[in-house]
């Protein structure tokens, strides 16, 4: 990691991170950027706000007059300008009046990026044609911006609606193309927004490219009304923006396709929706690129439509990871988080890789194992969680392979560009760490990215052994054969040993969620269905891991509410209802004029009735605080489990990438050991075993925010 800058954050500083203020002016004139930070403007344009000068004033950009760009803003006493034509690098915006003067430096970057994520990943495969945007205009995968309209039909959608096999760009079930020049269709639906307005369900759909990603922005808008801009918002928009993040985890080297922005639950209530292909972890699992892309798309949104009252994140699995990591590492981009089936961060790779190692080891031991014993060692409710092809190495691009195997490239990457140890050793390496090479840097010996991957001293199956679910011979042999990975991600006999620099980078740069940044002051509504028994990695205890980390970092997790749904059937609280709760929570905070701290406000201003809860299969709501091993009906209905690290003694925070070691000691085991057995364990663990009563090696809280690479 080579961060050029980092910002140390306080609650006060957060409020101005995305509204970059000028130096204090002697007579009260002030300039600020609404669309982004002043030092991270993109695409040659920025939306700026000034206190309205008394009488005449003059505004210049790099010495050129831009006074006419300023027009009255929504807030009394302010002027807003969309300042365009910025040159790459530093620009000076200045405003003068009899009231005083103010000067603001704007630093502009190309709309193709990068801004803070480091050098662009190469090779990079364009996919604009697959997205229906035509051939790319340049090597940065640029496409022309396209604006079209669609509408919601009152006709019943076809059976099945739009399935997974639908063509890219196909409209979701119930939506049809709308021709503004034609007569209104007879099946045009009406909808009532959160503001109580009943309007025609017509959606403006903008698609284009930003930061080499394909983006889409949608909102209710009648095309017979004036085109929306920062001074004339669509009268059907409720002023809020929902940013949707997609799941998965893959190494990138391609543009990818975005998730859908035609989300009925959100659009029907008047919310604007934004998505981008590089905010889908299945296209690229680099959370820094995700944050950068989101920042740039949001800046474009503000330049075109005006600043939203709130920006709310939503998305499941990898989409949840992006929200949590963005709130920690790039605070100010999201005002509220709505993660579903969440994980706290990308360090989930440890759980995934442990599964593949265990799956391999169980097939390599002389001892026999039944599935209950395997499950006990893994920590999960069922061994199916690990043996599933997505978690093991059953498919070439399974999640396990995507984490460590350099050859696990997406099919969109031509074989001539992809890494092959024999035929193309200089090709694109498609594991997680090489995807994040701008953050971790390269190992000078191998040329591959440094890895924060380690299982030295981990006693796999420790709790299962202590509880007599497995015997000593099984415990010993498993830990003798568990192994690790070579530089290309192939399983070898030697355990993984993390690069010391990579460990430090992982914690300091925020690749591990440590509850920093804005994670103590943003509202979090964490929802999930109960999938533990289905053999699904998205299990219940992940929300508890995040709760434990927030509590460890901040002394409380009062800004997080968790809702637990039954494993089957329709969720008792629909996404639109969840969004309404989040919006009310944010509205309450905005109206709170007390002198309380931001952390106190977010805890105090929850909507009435919004609290930890679960629902029975029959639909009964049970209000109970989230606990890992406590009593209560929710834990009886939906027991929480663990992963292999916790089953080996790691804490619930599950945030130790490399454990501190201690000597093997017979007193640490519940089953009695003979001197020969102790000697065998010492041979199996020559460096010692994990001491989880101590912090991990290099473990620390995130060091500042808004890192550049």
Enumerate the predicted regions with their spans:
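C-terminal His-loop and adjacent cap/lid subdomain of alpha/beta-hydrolase
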Residues: 25-709
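Bacterial N-terminal signal peptides that target proteins for export
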Residues: 1-9
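Bacterial N-terminal signal peptides
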Residues: 10-19
């Amino acid at each position: 990691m080579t961060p050029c800058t980092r910002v140390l954050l306080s609650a006060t500083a957060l409020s101005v991170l995305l509204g970059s203020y000028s130096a204090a002016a002697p007579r009260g004139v002030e300039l600020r950027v609404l669309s982004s930070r002043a030092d991270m403007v993109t695409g040659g344009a920025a939306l700026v706000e000034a206190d309205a000068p008394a009488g005449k004033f003059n505004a210049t950009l790099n010495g050129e007059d831009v006074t006419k760009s300023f027009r009255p803003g929504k807030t009394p006493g302010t002027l807003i300008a969309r300042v365009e034509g910025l040159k790459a690098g530093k620009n000076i915006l200045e405003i003068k009046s009899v009231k005083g003067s103010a000067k603001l430096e704007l630093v502009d970057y190309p709309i193709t990026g990068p801004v803070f994520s480091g050098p662009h990943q190469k090779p990079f495969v364009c996919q604009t044609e697959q997205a229906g945007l035509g051939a790319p205009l340049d090597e940065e995968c640029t496409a022309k911006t396209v604006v079209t309209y669609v509408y919601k039909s009152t006709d019943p959608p076809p059976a099945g609606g739009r399935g997974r096999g639908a063509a890219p760009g196909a409209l979701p079930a119930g939506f049809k193309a709308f021709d503004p020049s034609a007569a209104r269709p007879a099946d045009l639906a009406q909808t009532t927004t959160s503001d109580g307005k009943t309007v025609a369900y017509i959606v403006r759909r903008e698609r284009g490219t930003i930061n080499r990603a394909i983006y889409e922005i949608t909102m209710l808008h009648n095309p017979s009304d004036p085109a929306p801009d920062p001074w004339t918002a669509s009268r059907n928009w409720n002023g809020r923006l929902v940013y949707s993040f997609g799941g998965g985890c893959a190494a990138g080297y391609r543009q990818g396709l975005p998730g859908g922005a035609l989300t009925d639950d959100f659009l029907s209530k008047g919310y604007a929706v934004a998505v981008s292909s590089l905010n889908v972890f299945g296209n690229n699992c680099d959370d820094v690129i995700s944050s950068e892309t989101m920042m740039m798309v949001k800046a474009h949104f503000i330049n075109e439509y005006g600043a939203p009252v709130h920006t709310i994140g939503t998305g499941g699995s990898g989409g949840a990871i992006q929200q949590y990591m963005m709130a920690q590492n790039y605070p100010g981009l999201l005002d509220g988080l709505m993660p579903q089936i969440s994980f706290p961060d990308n360090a989930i790779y440890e759980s995934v890789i442990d599964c593949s190692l265990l799956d391999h080891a169980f097939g390599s031991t002389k001892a026999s194992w039944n599935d209950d014993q395997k499950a006990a060692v893994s920590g999960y409710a069922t061994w199916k969680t690990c043996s599933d092809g997505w978690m093991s190495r059953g498919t070439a691009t399974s999640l396990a392979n995507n984490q460590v195997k350099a050859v696990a490239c997406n099919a969109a990457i031509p074989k001539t560009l992809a890494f092959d140890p024999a035929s193309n050793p200089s090709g694109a390496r498609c594991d997680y760490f090489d995807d994040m090479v701008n953050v971790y840097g390269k190992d000078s010996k191998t040329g591959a990215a440094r890895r924060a991957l380690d299982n030295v001293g981990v006693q796999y199956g420790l709790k299962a052994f202590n509880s007599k679910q497995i015997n000593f011979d099984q415990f010993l042999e498993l830990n003798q054969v568990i192994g690790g990975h070579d530089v290309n991600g192939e399983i070898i006999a030697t355990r993984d040993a993390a690069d010391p620099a990579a460990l430090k980078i992982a914690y300091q740069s925020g690749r591990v969620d440590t509850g920093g940044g804005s994670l103590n002051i943003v509202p979090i509504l964490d929802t999930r269905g109960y999938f533990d028994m289905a053999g699904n990695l998205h299990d219940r205890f992940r929300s508890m891991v995040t709760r434990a980390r927030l509590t460890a970092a901040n002394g409380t997790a009062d800004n997080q509410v968790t809702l637990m749904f039954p494993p089957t059937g329709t969720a008792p609280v629909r996404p639109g209802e969840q969004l309404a709760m989040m919006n009310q929570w944010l509205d309450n905070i905005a109206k709170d004029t007390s002198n309380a701290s931001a952390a106190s406000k977010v805890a105090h201003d929850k909507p009435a009735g919004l609290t930890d809860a679960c629902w029975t299969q029959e639909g009964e709501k049970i209000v109970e605080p989230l606990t890992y091993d406590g009593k209560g009906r929710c834990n009886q209905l939906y027991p929480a489990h663990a992963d292999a690290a916790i089953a080996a003694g790691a804490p619930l925070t599950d945030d130790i990438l490399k454990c501190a070691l201690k000597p093997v000691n017979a007193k640490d085991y519940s089953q009695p050991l003979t001197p020969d057995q102790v000697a065998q364990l010492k041979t199996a663990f020559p460096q010692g075993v994990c001491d989880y009563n101590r912090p991990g090696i290099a473990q620390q809280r995130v060091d500042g925010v808004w890192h550049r690479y």
